[in-house]
């Protein structure tokens, strides 16, 4: 194990002992916010320190076995013990490396998932609907909560644009790799000649700001317009100006919400989505330099960056970032995404480990 890594683990062990002392004091719950911070930190450090203790025990076992090598009658036993201890140390060190990877501060946040139809007209809008169903089925499997924030339906039943809020443990950490361009190859329902068409949608996964106040938005920078909500094809579904369009003038970001009959609720939803979009923009600008120097699975935030192809005639899905092809498209479109997401998470961890190795 590298000295720098061991030094870090020793520091964490010392910190855990401090936390045990702080949490055992009688007045620990006097400040509930501080108590929650301490318990959260304790929960994060506990498994790491426990794993480190196992590594140290294995190192001690190896040292003890080395001392037995001088005894001819114990040599075979000692060599087995040394080999076993070293194997444990290698495995435990690899696990500790992953545990020490820098944690994305957004990983535990809820998300706004935005899907937009791109090239391909009606077929693209239908595929946007298919993608939405895929993510909703995945959310259902995770027991996450889903709330429709905004939708612009197409005439054939798909979506020109749709935004949902997904709330649940690890929502961002599991879905953050979905941002980018999604391409579909299939025979559209409207195609009479049986020809395969290619169309595309873009997906953006944005972490929800804890509070709107977390993102600084000057009210003077906002233009808020109200208009009548309308459904697919333009027919009015509401005779009052309940729909809300919020424009953030400095960035040009525009959010429309018209799903609720209450103008106040639509405005509140629009401001939440706006805060998430601004936060997402700031995040990608902040990491632009890093993304330029090394490949990043989360990407640049550029919607045109194609990340995945769904080929229906061949029943396959290919993720171009990690060169992974799965021939189980039907299950994937039904929300069975664990294998795909697991592969993306593993590759992301490998990227982080490589970058740490470069700087150590």
From Swiss-Prot:
It comes from the Bacteria. GO terms for molecular function: translation release factor activity, codon specific. The keyword Protein biosynthesis applies. The modification N5-methylglutamine is found at residue 235. SMART domains: PCRF (SM00937). InterPro entries: PCRF, Pep_chain_release_fac_I, Pep_chain_release_fac_I_sf, Prokaryotic/Mito_RF, RF-1. Pfam families: PCRF, RF-1. Belongs to the prokaryotic/mitochondrial release factor family. Peptide chain release factor 1 directs the termination of translation in response to the peptide chain termination codons UAG and UAA. This is Peptide chain release factor 1. The lineage of its organism: Bacteria, Pseudomonadati, Pseudomonadota, Betaproteobacteria, Burkholderiales. The gene is prfA.
């Amino acid at each position: 194990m590298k000295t720098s890594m061991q030094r870090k683990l020793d520091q964490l062990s010392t910190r855990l002992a401090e936390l045990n002392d702080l949490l055992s004091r009688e007045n620990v719950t006097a400040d509930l916010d501080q108590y929650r911070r301490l318990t959260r930190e304790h929960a994060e450090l506990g498994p790491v320190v426990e794993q480190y203790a196992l590594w140290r025990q294995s190192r001690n076992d190896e040292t003890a076995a080395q001392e037995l090598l001088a005894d001819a009658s114990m040599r075979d036993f000692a060599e087995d013990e040394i080999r076993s201890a070293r194997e444990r140390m290698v495995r435990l060190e690899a696990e500790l490396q992953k545990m020490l990877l820098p944690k994305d501060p957004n990983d535990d946040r809820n998300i706004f998932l935005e899907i937009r139809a791109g090239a391909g007209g009606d077929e693209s809008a239908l595929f946007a609907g298919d993608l939405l169903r895929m993510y909703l089925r995945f959310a259902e499997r995770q027991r996450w909560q889903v709330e429709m924030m905004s939708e612009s339906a197409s005439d054939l039943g798909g979506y020109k644009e749709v935004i949902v809020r997904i709330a649940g443990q690890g929502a961002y950490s599991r879905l953050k790799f979905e941002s980018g361009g999604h391409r579909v190859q299939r025979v559209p329902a409207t195609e009479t000649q049986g020809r395969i068409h290619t169309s595309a949608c873009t997906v953006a996964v944005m972490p929800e700001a804890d509070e709107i106040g977390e993102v600084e938005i000057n009210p003077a920078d906002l233009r808020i317009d109200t208009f009548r909500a309308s459904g697919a094809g333009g027919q009015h579904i509401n005779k009052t100006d309940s729909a809300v369009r919020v424009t953030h003038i400095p960035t040009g970001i525009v959010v429309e919400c018209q799903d609720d009959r209450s103008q106040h609720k639509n405005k509140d939803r629009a401001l939440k989505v706006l805060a998430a979009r601004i936060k997402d923009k700031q995040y990608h600008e902040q990491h632009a330099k890093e993304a330029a120097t090394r490949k990043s699975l989360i990407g640049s935030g550029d919607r045109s960056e194609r990340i995945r192809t769904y080929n229906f005639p061949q029943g396959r899905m290919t993720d171009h970032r990690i060169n992974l092809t799965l021939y189980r498209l039907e299950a994937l479109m039904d929300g069975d995404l664990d294998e795909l997401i697991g592969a993306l998470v593993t590759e992301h961890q490998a990227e982080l480990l490589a970058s740490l190795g470069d700087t150590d």
